[in-house]
């Protein structure tokens, strides 16, 4: 490949040569011309390599006189390899995803060789999706540019928290014309300037002896505090990076922490937690604070702007909040005062995180107000709510040598409080103000394939690693293709705004009419048999029958009557008398296209669950089963009961995570003890967030507990993000049968004999 030809700096011009060859060549020529022009005044000579990322059958082997990397060479960086890619060439969405992952690894290798000076590409919506994911994986500072037809729309999904630059193409990228010439030329020149500028700067200012860098979070209502903190930190010899706490801001800060760019944090404005808990538009996700604690860097935390939840224009505030105390910040931003009850939840979220810390943490709490609006005479002044937040944190946080809690008699924007924050930071931070700042390096193919070990929480996993790259070493081509087609259909539905609906079936007639109703997935497991025999679903978890044998028996009843819909098997992964690898092959040969972990120990809690984990019969065996099924190319749709389990399943390769809220509560034999519907929203969102941190493309469904009707499913789906549908079992076959038979008999009994 061209990356190995020279150790001199090199840029990649990347695109799909099968559809954008002329535009890619034109862009490459102007990048080279601009680099040569700028290089006349520079000691750097930068080479240009054209990289083809086409996903079609059409081959391109050269591009004018440029060094050229054909698509097959890029694809060789993916574990699927070129031959398997051919199977998916006609399935556009999956082909793009595979090529994007291959490009990510290709660029990682080039960056490891220390000669990658920048990347530039062009594309429509598909091309932008393909390129952006790979470009984002490169470290901050490496110039990365895409000329895109979607640069002027909603771009967060493309840019994330990276320094990727999108240039609007203005016209479609479809030939060279008077407009595209100007846009491509300007983008090429701008990119070349970025490349040469960075190379010259790196020569003059080495990054290996930089100042200790501190991340600081800010909102408009905490600006006086942050400005004072920043000014003092600079005097003390620190460099500061300030992040607007808008959801994206917190994620950007933690990404830089993970990358090694930030060595300490003053998390003054934690308002994103309020939006996450209550449902505002500037929310963090359930991983907030994790990167800081994992990297074990000094953390001083306060409660800035936890008196407010953010919404858009006043007309967009959800109906249930319309009677709350609202402050219109401007025409586009409305703020809602938080309540005593909500502040208790914020404290619980923060305390749960910080109590896990193994490094120095200091929490500073201002008694007289947490924002400019939380002061006497201001809209959000509420001493009861603010003092509740302080009391709860004092009560919940473990105050010890590792974690200090300081309650200070100031308002957050008082100069004395700002000084107290910095004093606390100096107490727990290293004495040196300079660091050997070496941001996280890119990974080789082997590194990436060995990433993401299953959580140590599950001892029965025995520390096994499961690749997140689509690694199917034990897959039959027909099984893998079936999985691919199913997932593509589901992704197509999601893109059209339609929910994914899965259903459990305990009888042939249930499965037959679930398919007739338009269901997307059907799962057979032993509880279906008990359920349709009038017993509770929990019977499937008790030693009343051989769970795996029941599923095989049900296959003969169900598979012949289901014509098109994917049918999966519920697998008891903790079965001590079955070799899982052989049993999965048996299920595959019978005709199942995928698996789910049921019966599951996730429905057990307390000492019994703990004993199962301790004696090697825990959730880890279910994770291991899903990983084995994934390697075989089977569709995997496991249940997860908490964020940690979702992470483990996502790392094992799960395609669809089903957020399980417990036994279904409705009907004559439903459970009576469960979380509330409102609590389910929070739990489902946390599981979805955890899943998407590991595998952004995973499908997430909600299931169980109080979610037992279309109305309740709609309630959850409308209040969550990244949740794509509902999976029902009792709600799909038991409840409809109970209601229909009861009503029908009642109608017959109401016949008049007179």
From Swiss-Prot:
Q: Where is this region: N-terminal inhibitory domain NN?
A: 1-201
Annotated GO MF terms: ATP binding; catalytic activity; protein homodimerization activity
Q: Which SUPFAM superfamilies match?
A: Phosphoenolpyruvate/pyruvate domain
Positions annotated to bind ATP: 18-20, 55, 92, 124-127
- Highest taxon above the source species: Eukaryota
Name which cysteines form disulfide bonds.
none
Q: Which UniProt keywords apply?
A: ATP-binding, Host-virus interaction, Nucleotide-binding, Plant defense
A Pfam family matched in the record: PEP_hydrolase
**Which biological process annotations from GO are given for this protein?**
defense response to virus; modulation by host of viral RNA genome replication
Which residues lie within the region annotated N-terminal inhibitory domain NC?
Answer: 211-431
Null allele phenotype? Increased sensitivity to tobamoviruses (ToMV,TMV).
Q: Which CDD domains match?
A: Tm-1-like
Subunit structure and binding partners: Homodimer.
Q: Which family does it belong to?
A: Belongs to the UPF0261 family.
**What else does the entry mention about this protein?**
Transgenic tobacco plants expressing Tm-1 exhibit resistance to tobacco mild green mosaic virus (TMGMV) and pepper mild mottle virus (PMMoV), tobamoviruses that cannot multiply in tomato.
State the function annotated in the UniProt record: Inhibitor of viral RNA replication which confers resistance to some tobamoviruses including tomato mosaic virus (ToMV) (e.g. isolate L), tobacco mosaic virus (TMV), tobacco mild green mosaic virus (TMGMV) and pepper mild mottle virus (PMMoV), but not to resistance-breaking isolates of ToMV (e.g. LT1, SL-1 and ToMV1-2) and tomato brown rugose fruit virus (ToBRFV). Prevents tobamoviruses RNA replication by affecting the association of tobamoviruses replication proteins (large and small subunits) with host membrane-associated proteins (e.g.
Q: What is this protein called?
A: ToMV resistance protein Tm-1(GCR237)
Specify the species: Solanum lycopersicum
Q: Give me the gene this protein comes from.
A: Tm-1
């Amino acid at each position: 490949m061209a990356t190995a030809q020279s150790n001199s700096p090199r840029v990649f011009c990347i695109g799909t040569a099968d559809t954008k060859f002329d535009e890619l060549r034109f862009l490459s020529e102007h990048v080279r011309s601009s680099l040569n022009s700028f290089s006349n005044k520079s000691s750097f000579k930068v080479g240009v390599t054209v990289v083809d990322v086409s996903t079609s059958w059409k081959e391109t082997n050269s591009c004018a006189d440029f060094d050229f990397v054909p698509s097959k060479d890029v694809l060789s960086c993916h574990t699927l390899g070129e031959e398997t890619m051919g199977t998916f060439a006609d399935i556009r969405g999956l082909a793009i995803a595979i090529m994007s992952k291959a490009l990510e690894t290709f660029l990682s290798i080039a960056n490891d060789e220390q000669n990658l000076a920048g990347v530039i590409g062009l594309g429509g919506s598909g091309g932008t999706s393909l390129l952006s994911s790979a470009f984002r994986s490169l470290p901050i500072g490496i110039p990365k540019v895409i000329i895109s037809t979607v640069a002027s729309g909603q771009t967060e999904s493309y840019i994330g928290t990276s320094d990727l630059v999108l240039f609007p193409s203005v016209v479609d990228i479809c030939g060279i014309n008077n407009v595209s010439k100007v846009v491509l030329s300007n983008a090429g020149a701008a990119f070349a300037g970025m490349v040469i500028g960075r190379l010259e700067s790196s020569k003059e200012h080495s990054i290996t002896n930089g100042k200790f860098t501190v991340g600081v979070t800010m909102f408009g209502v905490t600006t006086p505090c942050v400005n004072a903190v920043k000014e003092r930190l600079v005097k003390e010899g620190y460099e500061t990076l300030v992040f607007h706490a808008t959801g994206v801001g917190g994620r950007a800060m933690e990404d830089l922490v993970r990358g090694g760019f930030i060595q300490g944090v003053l998390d003054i404005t934690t308002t994103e937690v309020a939006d996450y808990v209550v449902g505002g538009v500037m929310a963090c996700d359930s991983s907030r604070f994790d990167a800081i604690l994992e990297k074990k860097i000094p953390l001083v935390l306060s409660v800035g702007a936890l008196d407010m939840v953010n919404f858009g224009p006043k007309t967009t505030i959800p109906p249930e909040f319309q009677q709350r105390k609202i402050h219109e910040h401007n025409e586009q931003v409305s703020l809602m005062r938080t309540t005593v009850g909500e502040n208790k939840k914020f404290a619980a979220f923060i305390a749960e995180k910080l109590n896990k810390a193994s490094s120095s943490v200091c929490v500073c709490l201002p008694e007289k107000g947490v924002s400019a609006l939380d002061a006497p005479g201001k809209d959000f002044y509420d001493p009861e709510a603010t003092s509740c937040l302080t009391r709860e944190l004092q009560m919940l946080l473990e105050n010890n040598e590792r974690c200090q809690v300081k309650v200070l008699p100031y308002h957050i924007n008082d100069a004395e409080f700002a000084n107290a924050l910095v004093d606390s930071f100096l107490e727990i931070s290293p004495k040196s103000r300079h660091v050997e700042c070496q941001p996280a390096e890119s990974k080789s193919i082997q590194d990436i394939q060995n990433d993401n070990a299953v959580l140590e929480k599950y001892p029965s996993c025995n520390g096994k690693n499961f690749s997140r790259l689509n690694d199917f070493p034990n897959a039959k081509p027909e099984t893998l293709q079936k999985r691919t087609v199913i997932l593509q259909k589901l992704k197509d539905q999601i893109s059209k705004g339609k929910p994914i609906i899965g259903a459990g079936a305990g009888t042939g007639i249930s499965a037959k009419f679930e398919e007739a109703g338009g269901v997307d997935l059907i799962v057979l497991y032993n509880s279906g048999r008990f359920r349709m025999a009038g017993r509770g679903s929990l019977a499937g978890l008790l030693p009343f029958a051989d769970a795996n044998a029941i599923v095989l028996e049900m296959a003969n009843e169900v598979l012949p009557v289901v014509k098109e819909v994917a049918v999966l098997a519920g697998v008891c992964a903790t079965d001590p008398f079955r070799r899982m690898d052989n049993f999965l092959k048996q299920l595959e040969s019978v005709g199942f296209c995928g698996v789910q972990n049921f019966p599951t120990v996730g429905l057990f809690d307390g000492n019994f669950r703990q004993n199962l984990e301790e004696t090697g019969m825990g959730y880890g065996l279910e994770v291991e089963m899903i990983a084995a099924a994934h390697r075989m190319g089977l569709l995997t749709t496991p249940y997860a009961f908490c964020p940690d389990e979702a992470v483990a399943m996502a790392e094992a390769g799960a395609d669809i995570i089903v957020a399980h809220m417990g036994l279904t509560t409705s009907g004559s034999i439903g459970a009576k003890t469960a979380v509330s519907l409102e609590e389910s929203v929070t739990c489902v969102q946390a599981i979805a967030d955890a899943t998407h941190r590991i595998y952004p493309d995973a499908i997430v469904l909600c299931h169980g507990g109080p979610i037992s009707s279309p109305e309740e499913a709609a309630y959850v789906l409308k209040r969550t993000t990244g949740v794509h549908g509902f999976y029902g079992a009792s709600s799909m076959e038991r409840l409809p049968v109970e209601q229909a038979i009861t009503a029908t008999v009642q109608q017959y009994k109401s016949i008049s004999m007179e």
